[in-house]
C-alpha cells in the first residue's frame, strides 16, 4: 500500500453502486475454499480493493482478516464483470480473480469453519467451506 489507510473503491449513488473487488481461488486436494454468509450464496474469498492498495495486497489482507491465514498470490486467473442488486440499487462490479496458495496451514483443510467480515461497519458472520470441484461442475 502506498502509505496510510484509504477507503474501499466502492461508490454509492442514489441510482447505483460501483464496486472493485478481488478474489482468491484457493484449491486443496480437489476442493475450493468458498465463503458463505448465513442464508446466502457461496462466494470466492476476497473483498473490496482500497484506494492506493494493489489487488494482491488486498487479497493478502482479506485472507488474514477473515480466516487468519497467510497466502501468496499466484497468477491472475480471470476478470469478471457482474451486475446484481445491492439492496434496492443495482451494482456494477469489476472483479479480479487470482490463484492463491497457503503459506501456513493454520486453518482446517477440510469441512466447514467459521469466520467473519465487516462491511459498512457491520459484522457479517461467514461459513468457510471446502467444496469439491466436482460439485461445482455439477452445479450443486
Would you name each region that the model predicts?
Residues 28:
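A cytosolic small-molecule/anion-sensing beta-strand core signal
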Residues 2-23:
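Acidic, metal-coordinating catalytic segment for phosphate/diphosphate chemistry
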Residues 49-72, 83-139:
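Unchanged
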Residues 43-46:
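A short gly/proline-enriched turn/hairpin at secondary-structure junctions
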Residues 21-23, 70-73:
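Conserved beta-strand residues within beta-sheet cores
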Amino acid at each position: 500500500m502506498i502509505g496510510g489507510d484509504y477507503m474501499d473503491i466502492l461508490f454509492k449513488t442514489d441510482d447505483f453502486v460501483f464496486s472493485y473487488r478481488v478474489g482468491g481461488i484457493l484449491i486443496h486436494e480437489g476442493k475450493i475454499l468458498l465463503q458463505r454468509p448465513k442464508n446466502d450464496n457461496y462466494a470466492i474469498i476476497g473483498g473490496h480493493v482500497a484506494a492506493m492498495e494493489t489487488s494482491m495486497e488486498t487479497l493478502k489482507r482479506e485472507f488474514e482478516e477473515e480466516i487468519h491465514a497467510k497466502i501468496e498470490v499466484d497468477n491472475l486467473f480471470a476478470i469478471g464483470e457482474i451486475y446484481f442488486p445491492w439492496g434496492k440499487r443495482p451494482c456494477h462490479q469489476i472483479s479480479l480473480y487470482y490463484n492463491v496458495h497457503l503459506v501456513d496451514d493454520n486453518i482446517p483443510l477440510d469441512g466447514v469453519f467459521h469466520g467473519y467480515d465487516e462491511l459498512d461497519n457491520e459484522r457479517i458472520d461467514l461459513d468457510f467451506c471446502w467444496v469439491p470441484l466436482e460439485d461445482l461442475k455439477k452445479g450443486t
